[in-house]
UniProtKB/Swiss-Prot annotation:
It comes from Staphylococcus aureus (strain MRSA252). One of its GO terms (biological process) is response to stress. Keywords: DNA-binding, Transcription, Transcription regulation. It comes from the Bacteria. This is Uncharacterized HTH-type transcriptional regulator SAR2349.
């Protein structure tokens, strides 16, 4: 089935991609899960634990544990909401912002090097991004309907 092959093709690149990015993250003493949440906060700050859990499709306890490590490493700050004391807003610290910028640059260089070794056009990449975003939205909706 073509749909099965379609999904399997994305699953098969995931592990090799992680292996290529691991040295970059290790150099900066950050794990991949921490990086994904740090990047999410950078793109959506201020944000909350619940919003991160929803966007990343991870359980709140998992996100909470990762956030604790990021807080302990002085990469993010937590501020109570003025309207609702139960709600806490997360933002990057200056150290977190600096790390985000450095790791982004290193990862972008890696990604550009990989793409340069292929014959993928800009249009093909954009179409793939569009399709993956559509699928991501559907999967998030399905996951939250359970």
């Amino acid at each position: 089935m073509l749909s099965q092959e379609f999904f399997n093709s994305f699953i098969t690149i995931y592990r090799p991609y992680l292996k290529l990015t691991e040295p970059i993250l290790e150099k900066h003493n950050i794990y991949y899960g921490q990086w994904l949440i740090l990047r999410d906060i950078a793109k959506h700050q201020p944000t909350t634990l619940i919003e991160i859990s929803h966007r990343r499709a991870i359980e709140k306890p998992t996100a909470r544990k990762t956030l604790k490590a990021l807080i302990e490493n002085d990469l993010i700050t937590v501020e109570n909401s003025l309207e609702d004391k139960r709600q806490k807003f997360l933002t990057l610290t200056p150290k977190g912002h600096e790390l985000y910028e450095i790791v982004c640059l290193d990862v972008q260089k890696l990604q550009q090097a990989v793409v340069a070794k292929t014959n993928i056009s800009q249009d093909q990449m954009q179409e793939t991004i569009n399709v993956m975003n559509q699928i991501h939205e559907i999967l998030l909706k399905e996951a939250h309907n359970d």
